[in-house]
Structures are given as C-alpha cells and as structure tokens.
Amino acid sequence: MSRQWLFSTNHKDIGTLYFIFGAWAGMVGTSLSILIRAELGHPGAFIGDDQIYNVIVTAHAFIMIFFMVMPIMIGGFGNWLVPLMLGAPDMAFPRMNNMSFWMLPPSLTLLISSSMVENGAGTGWTVYPPLSSGIAHAGASVDLAIFSLHLAGISSILGAVNFITTVINMRAPGITLDRMPLFVWSVVITAVLLLLSLPVLAGAITMLLTDRNLNTSFFDPAGGGEPNLYQHLFWFFGHPEVYILILPGFGMISHIITQESGKKETFGNLGMIYAMLAIGLLGFIVWAHHMFTVGMDVDTRAYFTSATMIIAVPTGIKIFSWLATMHGTQLTYSPAMLWAFGFVFLFTVGGLTGVVLANSSIDIVLHDTYYVVAHFHYVLSMGAVFAIMAGFIHWYPLLTGLTMNPNWLKLQFAMMFVGVNLTFFPQHFLGLAGMPRRYSDFPDSYLAWNIVSSLGSTISLFAILYFLFIIWESMITQRTPAFPMQLSSSIEWYHTLPPAEHTYAELPLLTNNF
C-alpha cells in the first residue's frame, strides 16, 4: 500500500491522489462558501464580526483555487491524460511528480492553521498591504498563509517543469506538435504560464514576509516603500493565474464536444492552438485592469482597457469553433455533453461581463462590488467547475472502468445548473446597485437578491452531494462499460478500461490514418 500510494512514481496513481485531494479540498471550500451565503442570507450579524467573515472568504478563495481547481485540472486530468495522449509510458520526472503532490497536503495544513491561530488571515485572497502588514494583521496568521502559498507555488512550478519536459521529449513518433491533442496543448500552455507567473508571486509574498518580520519596508511608505508595488507584482501573477484555471478546461471541452459530436477533429484545430497561445501571451500584459481604482494615468488606463478587450478575440474564436464543431450533428444530450453546453453558454456570459469590466471608467464604479464577484464566479464556478464536471464524467470510464447512471447525472446537472445560476445571476443586480464585496452585512435594500442567492447556494450544495452519491453508487454496483460510445478524439481510449498500470511498454507509432 505505502509503495503504491506514498512513494508512487506512476502517473495514474499520482493523478488519482490529486483527484482525491482536490475532491476533499473542494468539500472544505464548498462548506466555507455555504458559511458565506448563510451569513449573507439575512441582514445583521450571524457568524460573527467582519474579521471572521473575511477569514472565511479568504480561505474559501485559496482552497478553491490552489487546492481544488488546480490539483484536479492540472494534477488529476493532466497526470492521467497527458502521458496517455502522448503515447508516453509516464511523465518525464516521475519522482518529482510524486513530490509535487505531497507538497500540497502540508500546504493546505498551513493554510488551515493560519485561520486557527490568532485572528486568522482576513485579508482577502489578494493579501494587500497595509491590511496584511504587521500592524493591521499582527500575529502569525498571514505568515502561515504566506508559507502555504510558497509550498503550493513550488509544487506547481515543479509540476509545470515536468509537463513541459514531458511534452517536449516524450511524444510518440508521429505525434508532431500540430497533431498533438488540444488537451495536451492546453496543459503545456498552462505550465508555461505557471512557470513565468509564480516566481513573481513568490517575490511579492517574500517581501511581504520580510516587511512583517524583518523590519524591511518594501510596501511601507514610512520607510520609503510603495504599497502599490505589491499590487503590481501580485496581479502580474494573479491575472495569468485565472487563465491557468480555465485553459485546461478549454482543452477538455474541446475533446468532449468533438467526441460527443461524432466529428473527426475539432473545427479549426490549428486555430484553437493559436487561440490558446494568444490567450496565454495576452494574459501577461493586462494585469493592471485589476487596479483601475489606484490612480493610474489616463493613457495607462486606455492601454489596459484595450489590451483586456483584445483577449475577447481569441476567446471568441474558441467559442465559435466549439459551436462550429457541434454544427450539423444530431446532438446527443449525454451528461458530459450537457456540462459542455453549460460551459460554453455560461462561460460566454461570464466573458461578456468581463468585457463590461474591462472599461476602466465603468470599472471605477463597479470595482469591489458584487458585479465583479458575479463575473469571476461565472467563469470559475460555471466555467472551471463545469469543465471539471464534464471532464470527470467523460473520462470516468477510463479512470475507473465503471459507468455512472446517466439519468441521475442529467438530473444532477439540472440541479447544479439551477443552483449556480440562482446563486450568481442576482449578484449582477446587487453589484449594479452598489453592494460592496467582503462585507458581512448590508443595507436592507439588498435583502431580496441576497436571499435568492443564498437559496441557490443551498441547491448547489445538494447537487454536489447528489453527485457524490452517484459516484458511490457506480462503485458499489461495479457496472463496467462495454466499449466507448463514440469515435475517440484521442488515443487515450485505445486501452483497456481502466488502462493497465503501465501503458505503452512498447511505444506506439502514429500513422496518417489516425
């Protein structure tokens, strides 16, 4: 047991560990979100003061981003599928792969500890000084959160190096870069973004650590520092990070739509690759659109507004290519396809509110209101999460060799779809009416939509529990699939379900008939 799970060098076992860890962290993060909506479901205090509320909000963000979405998408799906899709026997650095995973549980432990000592880190996930300085947040909480981020960051950097090396060196003969599956492309682009952005975050939080403990003043004006420098460094990481969260989802959705539509390949395959490359590149030159309210020159604001809007172009290319892939087919309303439909529609809605927020003059008004919360939850809670659900259902027979009950899955999709939309759509109205983020209480005029939002979160919770029940049911009944339902979009299906522990003992050769 310990050889298989603690010291594993097998990409499938490590991928499974990532899935289990991500699911567990996801349940913690979901519980925190339920606490947030319970607090906001009625006026007046419920859980406590704003410090504990902001600790919950901060932990919710960190856990969902660093311990749920990234481990599942990059660690889980990436580890499982990239070697299988490349025809590689394993990852390039199998032991480093294991270390990448085992840095996450200590990291999560540090983060949870940070909320249990002193007053907790109630800084928001951005950890801006001076709120995160040694004066406003005395005690060890923020320091523990910083160490947690360092560990998670090292884990991601090592994983990124591993994926990049694997994709460069371990492709089977015949898999040229232009014929590499879109999911593999999405993971390698994500890995490059991680490699370039995380060191900047590490620098920023290390400077914050020394400001708090070693009497430096990088971000303290009293010592000649500049609090704004932190924001620039943080968002230079923070904006690529949001593309890191969604790009593997793009790759998965491309595979699912192509395969379920019965098409030979995705519409505009090469264009899809260039679109992802463009999104990755542009993601690095738009960071200050998170900072329109800090007082930038009008020409700077004009540049960041324009550059941000340009990102909508490659994103639009991807949306329309997905629609073109579905075009002309007899649509199958299979569970995975339903999630993919939901992804395309809701991600588009989230993208449109993003284009609204890109306008610096409008953003001055909407900054730090619930409009922003609604925007990024549409692209995360209904983009990244829907992609994870679609991918998990689609590749579940490959991962486990079992099938889930498709009718139950459709019901579960309907519950989740209603739940998340009921939760986040009203938040657009709250934001337009001026309700600010990160406050535990609000004027009574905002009550009605907050009640609707909290009701939606309860429905989402039951949908998640139902999904766990569906997985449990499939595992105790042990229904095995006879064969994959459609022509496969990639070579990972040319194995037993589930694949043998070691695949591609003899390297495959891909011919033009592929």
Swiss-Prot record:
<feature type="transmembrane region" description="Helical">
    <location>
        <begin position="55"/>
        <end position="75"/>
    </location>
</feature>
<feature type="binding site" description="axial binding residue">
    <location>
        <position position="375"/>
    </location>
    <ligand>
        <name>heme a3</name>
    </ligand>
</feature>
<feature type="binding site">
    <location>
        <position position="368"/>
    </location>
    <ligand>
        <name>Mg(2+)</name>
    </ligand>
</feature>
<feature type="transmembrane region" description="Helical">
    <location>
        <begin position="304"/>
        <end position="324"/>
    </location>
</feature>
<feature type="binding site">
    <location>
        <position position="44"/>
    </location>
    <ligand>
        <name>Ca(2+)</name>
    </ligand>
</feature>
<feature type="transmembrane region" description="Helical">
    <location>
        <begin position="16"/>
        <end position="36"/>
    </location>
</feature>
<keyword id="KW-0106">Calcium</keyword>
<dbReference type="GO" id="GO:0020037">
    <property type="term" value="F:heme binding"/>
</dbReference>
<keyword id="KW-0408">Iron</keyword>
<comment type="similarity">
    <text>Belongs to the heme-copper respiratory oxidase family.</text>
</comment>
<keyword id="KW-0679">Respiratory chain</keyword>
<dbReference type="GO" id="GO:0006123">
    <property type="term" value="P:mitochondrial electron transport, cytochrome c to oxygen"/>
</dbReference>
<comment type="subunit">
    <text>Component of the cytochrome c oxidase (complex IV, CIV), a multisubunit enzyme composed of a catalytic core of 3 subunits and several supernumerary subunits. The complex exists as a monomer or a dimer and forms supercomplexes (SCs) in the inner mitochondrial membrane with ubiquinol-cytochrome c oxidoreductase (cytochrome b-c1 complex, complex III, CIII).</text>
</comment>
<feature type="transmembrane region" description="Helical">
    <location>
        <begin position="233"/>
        <end position="253"/>
    </location>
</feature>
<feature type="transmembrane region" description="Helical">
    <location>
        <begin position="413"/>
        <end position="433"/>
    </location>
</feature>
<dbReference type="InterPro" id="IPR033944">
    <property type="entry name" value="Cyt_c_oxase_su1_dom"/>
</dbReference>
<feature type="transmembrane region" description="Helical">
    <location>
        <begin position="267"/>
        <end position="287"/>
    </location>
</feature>
<keyword id="KW-0479">Metal-binding</keyword>
<feature type="binding site">
    <location>
        <position position="289"/>
    </location>
    <ligand>
        <name>Cu cation</name>
    </ligand>
</feature>
<feature type="binding site" description="axial binding residue">
    <location>
        <position position="60"/>
    </location>
    <ligand>
        <name>Fe(II)-heme a</name>
    </ligand>
</feature>
<keyword id="KW-0186">Copper</keyword>
<dbReference type="GO" id="GO:0045277">
    <property type="term" value="C:respiratory chain complex IV"/>
</dbReference>
<dbReference type="GO" id="GO:0046872">
    <property type="term" value="F:metal ion binding"/>
</dbReference>
<feature type="transmembrane region" description="Helical">
    <location>
        <begin position="379"/>
        <end position="399"/>
    </location>
</feature>
<feature type="binding site">
    <location>
        <position position="239"/>
    </location>
    <ligand>
        <name>Cu cation</name>
    </ligand>
</feature>
<comment type="function">
    <text>Component of the cytochrome c oxidase, the last enzyme in the mitochondrial electron transport chain which drives oxidative phosphorylation. The respiratory chain contains 3 multisubunit complexes succinate dehydrogenase (complex II, CII), ubiquinol-cytochrome c oxidoreductase (cytochrome b-c1 complex, complex III, CIII) and cytochrome c oxidase (complex IV, CIV), that cooperate to transfer electrons derived from NADH and succinate to molecular oxygen, creating an electrochemical gradient over the inner membrane that drives transmembrane transport and the ATP synthase.</text>
</comment>
<keyword id="KW-0496">Mitochondrion</keyword>
<feature type="binding site">
    <location>
        <position position="367"/>
    </location>
    <ligand>
        <name>Mg(2+)</name>
    </ligand>
</feature>
<feature type="binding site">
    <location>
        <position position="243"/>
    </location>
    <ligand>
        <name>O2</name>
    </ligand>
</feature>
<dbReference type="InterPro" id="IPR023616">
    <property type="entry name" value="Cyt_c_oxase-like_su1_dom"/>
</dbReference>
<comment type="pathway">
    <text>Energy metabolism; oxidative phosphorylation.</text>
</comment>
<keyword id="KW-1278">Translocase</keyword>
<keyword id="KW-1133">Transmembrane helix</keyword>
<keyword id="KW-0812">Transmembrane</keyword>
<feature type="transmembrane region" description="Helical">
    <location>
        <begin position="337"/>
        <end position="357"/>
    </location>
</feature>
<keyword id="KW-0349">Heme</keyword>
<keyword id="KW-0460">Magnesium</keyword>
<feature type="transmembrane region" description="Helical">
    <location>
        <begin position="144"/>
        <end position="164"/>
    </location>
</feature>
<feature type="binding site">
    <location>
        <position position="290"/>
    </location>
    <ligand>
        <name>Cu cation</name>
    </ligand>
</feature>
<feature type="cross-link" description="1'-histidyl-3'-tyrosine (His-Tyr)">
    <location>
        <begin position="239"/>
        <end position="243"/>
    </location>
</feature>
<feature type="transmembrane region" description="Helical">
    <location>
        <begin position="182"/>
        <end position="202"/>
    </location>
</feature>
<dbReference type="InterPro" id="IPR000883">
    <property type="entry name" value="Cyt_C_Oxase_1"/>
</dbReference>
